[in-house]
Amino acid sequence: MTKLENPVLMATIGGAQGLRGEVRAKAYTADPSALGDYGHLHSMDGRSFEVLEIRETKNVVIVRFRGVNDRNAAEALNGLELYIERDNLPDEELEDDEFYYADLEGLEARDDKGASYGTVTGVFDFGAGDLLELKGPGKRPVLIPFSEASVLEIDLEAGTLLIDPLAAGLVDDPEELSKFTADKPKKKK
């Protein structure tokens, strides 16, 4: 049983394919057929899966794992999410302006005046472009576009995103920015 310290979601199993124990899976990698190149995949309940074969189809990959030899065993994996340890992702292949979604989660979103708009709690792609989910203390989560106009700078070492709250849709009017500033004037008693 393996417990991952910094898990990164790589695929979700969708169901059995055929009679030999193969499964259909949605891969969350740039190259879906490279799913097995990252080493063993792990479930959150501690199981480990070694990819023996993988082939691409139109919307999913068909995967055969060691030890999953029949349809019943494959069906038992339906809906299972598979992860790898963050350290297994190849950082040297990233360009300066490329990031893994997993590295963005936990960053604090701030504007140029230092006001905080929350922490990145998720990164989503619903088809029209990537979105960042921000959650602040006592606030409901909000989604902002992950675009050059909204996210001006990413500093992984400092743990921050520099955002433009107007472009991100967090405020409708530039004058509203003053209510988010870090140094709010205190009310007189």
Swiss-Prot record:
Sample GO molecular function, one term: ribosome binding
GO CC, any one term: ribosome
Keywords from the named record: Chaperone, Cytoplasm, Ribosome biogenesis, rRNA processing
Domain PRC barrel positions: 95-177
Main subcellular location of this protein, as a coarse class: cytoplasm
Record Pfam families: PRC, RimM
Sections of the chain in a coiled coil: none
Record InterPro entries: PRC-brl_dom, PRC_barrel-like_sf, RimM, RimM_N, RimM_N_sf, Transl_B-barrel_sf
Cited function: An accessory protein needed during the final step in the assembly of 30S ribosomal subunit, possibly for assembly of the head region. Essential for efficient processing of 16S rRNA. May be needed both before and after RbfA during the maturation of 16S rRNA. It has affinity for free ribosomal 30S subunits but not for 70S ribosomes.
PANTHER family named in the record: RIBOSOME MATURATION FACTOR RIMM
Family per record: Belongs to the RimM family.
Stored HAMAP family: Ribosome_mat_RimM
Comment block on domains: The PRC barrel domain binds ribosomal protein uS19.
Subunit structure: Binds ribosomal protein uS19.
Protein name (database record): Ribosome maturation factor RimM
Species whose genome carries this gene: Rhizobium leguminosarum bv. trifolii (strain WSM2304)
